[in-house]
């Protein structure tokens, strides 16, 4: 969020700045305060394509405790009452626009230049970006304060990316073994692994690596979000189809289609792909 603007309209009362969390009610009150404070475009449900689509899934799933798939990763569950309520609420909230002209990267640009006051497509790479101003500031110098997605339960579930190494089996055992040796050095050598993680600009998956960002204020603060990482549902069959169906569904809602109808089409098509 643009914390400078949030404080300007007195909405920082809805934010737990220690935990970087807020309730769904607090989120909606913050949007309302910004909208009534003269900021017509508070946030966008961007849906021009799949870029940054993890953000729109996360805001919708978190608001009322919905999920994107079942726990076994066999089917898509976006048609739950919780998800339908979230989509309808976002659609009906003044200041939040379903925008089929932008994807995640465009939303980030609009947030940085002050057009939007919130961004759903956000991660540590954006927080640390210093292309147009110092890290943690908008182009105009406003404070960017990272937030977990709003929830009713107080237990946000963030969409994280799991990055690692892979080896292609090209039939050459010597090359395969060399690749294993290299990966082991990069990811497990006690003298190298810290530098490897630092070079990635992200976080280690093993606690044994230690607190490598102790001297970096932004990274240390952002490490609080690691505890909020949710299910890695991207392994569900039919994933490529589901991603396309998702932003198409959001476009239809933004164009006025009934939410339940739009969501049913998404689930029918995504689950057909999952079962194929």
Regions found by a protein language model. Give the residues of each.
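Periplasmic solute-binding protein
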Residues: 1-16, 28, 47-72, 154, ...
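Short helix-initiation/N-cap motifs at beta->coil->alpha
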Residues: 20-26, 99-113
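Glycine-centered hinge/linker elements that transmit conformational signals in sensory
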Residues: 28-35, 72-102
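Bilobed periplasmic-binding protein-like "clamshell/Venus-flytrap" ligand-binding domains
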Residues: 36-50, 188-199, 273-276
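Extracytoplasmic/periplasmic substrate-recognition and gating elements
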Residues: 88, 93-96, 134-201
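Short, solvent-exposed loop/beta-turn-alpha elements that line the ligand-binding surface or hinge
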Residues: 16-20, 43-45, 66-85, 133-138, ...
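Paired acidic/hydrophobic, glycine-rich loop segments that form the ligand-binding mouth/hinge
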Residues: 117-122
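Conserved C-terminal helix/tail region of periplasmic/extracytoplasmic solute-binding proteins
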Residues: 191, 203-205, 210, 223-276
């Amino acid at each position: 969020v643009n914390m400078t603007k949030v404080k300007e309209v007195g909405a920082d009362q809805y934010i737990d700045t220690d935990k970087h969390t807020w309730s769904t009610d607090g989120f909606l009150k913050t949007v309302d305060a910004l909208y009534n404070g003269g900021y017509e475009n508070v946030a966008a449900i961007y849906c021009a394509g799949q870029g940054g689509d993890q953000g729109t899934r996360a805001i919708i799933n978190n608001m009322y405790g919905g999920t994107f798939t079942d726990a076994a990763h066999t089917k898509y569950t976006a048609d739950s009452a919780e998800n339908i309520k979230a989509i309808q609420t976002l659609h009906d909230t003044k200041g939040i626009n379903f925008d089929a002209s932008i994807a995640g990267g465009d939303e980030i640009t609009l947030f940085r230049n002050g057009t939007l006051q919130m961004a759903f497509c956000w991660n540590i790479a954006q927080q640390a970006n210093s292309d147009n101003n110092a890290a943690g500031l908008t182009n105009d110098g406003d404070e960017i304060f990272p937030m977990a997605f709003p929830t009713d339960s107080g237990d946000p579930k963030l969409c994280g990316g799991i990055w690692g190494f892979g080896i292609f089996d090209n039939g050459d055992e010597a090359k395969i073994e060399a690749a294993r040796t290299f990966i082991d050095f990069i990811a497990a050598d006690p003298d190298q692994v810290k530098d490897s993680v630092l070079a990635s600009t992200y976080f280690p998956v093993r606690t044994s690596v230690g607190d490598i960002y102790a001297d970096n204020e932004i990274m240390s603060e952002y490490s609080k979000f690691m505890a909020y990482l949710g299910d890695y549902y991207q392994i569900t069959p039919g994933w490529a189809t589901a991603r396309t169906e998702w932003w198409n569904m959001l476009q239809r809602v933004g164009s006025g289609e009934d939410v339940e109808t739009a969501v049913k089409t998404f689930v029918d098509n995504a689950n057909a792909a999952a079962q194929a």
